[in-house]
Amino acid sequence: MDSTGRQPLSQDGQPWQALASGLGFPDEDQKYWWSVMAPLLGELMKWANYPVDKQYLVLAFCHEYILPFCGPRPTAEGGIFWPTLITKDGTPFEPSLNFYKNKATLRVGYAPACELSGSNDDPINQRAPIAALEHQKRVLPQQNLKWVDNFKKAWFIDNDDAVALKARVHNELFEQAAVQCLIGYVFSDYTQVKVAMSPLWKSVQTGQQISRVIWDTFRQLGDDASSYLDCLSVLEEYTESKQAKLAQVQPSFVNFDVNLKGDYQQSRLKVYYATPCTAFDTMVQVFTLGGRLKGPEVDHAIECLRVLWPSVLAVPENHPDDQDLPRRYHSVAVTQFNFELWPGAKLPVPQIYLPTNFYGRDELEIAEGLEGFFKTLGWSEPFHAYKQNYIATCATPEGKWKAIQHDVSFSFKDSSPYVSVYYKPELSVLSSPS
């Protein structure tokens, strides 16, 4: 192993290179996406100390089941064919590393697309995500798409109606936010699959608020959603409260597991929220659902969040907790949260996404902040030497970044912080689009 604890591989023998040589590509689009995706994933897995056979397994899965649904490559000017707000510049995929106690885990999220996406044959890109999920069934026999079917029935829009709706809205930024379906993977002991679906288009079509569409949909699911109703009622109560109005926070989409070891009704569900506010007091208020989530573990989580917040965000010295951070203009500068709903649970479990892409310190300062935070927790695995690993993984010899730290998520699970760092690939650095 080298000084970061990584297993050495010769530059000519990287798993991603071997797979490219052995499997090839059906077209230049997939060849391009592999050139920007695979080396970064390979380096992240070495950072997380994945054994070589696991690296091959993950990369082979990505080659077969993600690559065909990345859509056309960018234009010569760098324009993304089907941009979404999964990243602020529209890059359609985003890897992340989760750090939890003595383990680091690779995850990948992406917005499936194809040549039909945005055309009159598929104006709001509903085909590619479903095709991607169907395609991967053969290696994920436990995949259950019942939740996908439920929300597809409720929120997908007939093609003719979608054409008319898109023409009526005619708002590029809205279209990038209103993603009908995203897919995420957790490459742990087995491949976990998460699907996110948004009711934004349905909200416009029906004229209802997004929150109303979400709550009504869950109620209409009957027995499928009955074991989640206690948690949902807490979220709905908070969403309609004066506290939520002051925080300008609203739900935006739902997320659920589809590759399950048990019945689909054992799935974890999530409801995502977003707010333009950045005052620390507001973050705590949303994180605790206005004080509805409380107790020693919540108190401990807030203590840890207070340490992490200025470690990665550009918080001015002596900045008051009740004031927003100095504004850095971007049309979608928000802080996101999600709330996990487990069947039979009485209360949701909160998670916050610290918006380093909008309000972060510079890249090395973020890396130093994360390493310092890990040290306060007593985490000391080789992959917790964060700054050194980040430089080794994402810096070029010329001092450019192959990927930037786009978001840092934080939650608390089993009395321990649960931290994920999301890396936005810098396509212009990783590979020329033409």
From Swiss-Prot:
Q: Name a single GO biological process.
A: alkaloid metabolic process
What Pfam families does the annotation carry?
Trp_DMAT (PF11991)
Instruction: List the Gene Ontology MF annotations in alphabetical order.
Output: transferase activity, transferring alkyl or aryl (other than methyl) groups
Return the EC number.
2.5.1.-
Which residues does L-tryptophan bind? L85, I86, E94
Q: What positions does the entry give for substrate binding? A: R107, K194, R268, K270, Y272, Q351, Y353, Y418, Y422
Q: Which InterPro entries match?
A: Aro_prenylTrfase_DMATS, DMATS-type_fun
For this protein, the record's CDD domains field holds: PT-DMATS_CymD (cd13929)
Q: What class of enzyme is it?
A: transferase
What pathway does the UniProt record associate with this protein? Secondary metabolite biosynthesis
The answer to whether UniProt assigns keyword Transferase to this entry is: yes
Q: Does the keyword Ribosomal protein apply?
A: no
Which controlled-vocabulary keywords does the entry list?
Transferase
The intrachain disulfides are none
Top-rank taxon: Eukaryota
Name the family. Belongs to the tryptophan dimethylallyltransferase family.
This chain's function reads: Indole diterpene prenyltransferase; part of the gene cluster that mediates the biosynthesis of the indole diterpenes nodulisporic acids (NA). Nodulisporic acid A (NAA) and its chemically modified derivatives are of particular significance because of their highly potent insecticidal activity against blood-feeding arthropods and lack of observable adverse effects on mammals, in particular the tremogenicity associated with the paspaline-derived IDTs is not observed.
- What is the name of the protein in this document? Indole diterpene prenyltransferase nodD2
**Species of origin:** Hypoxylon pulicicidum
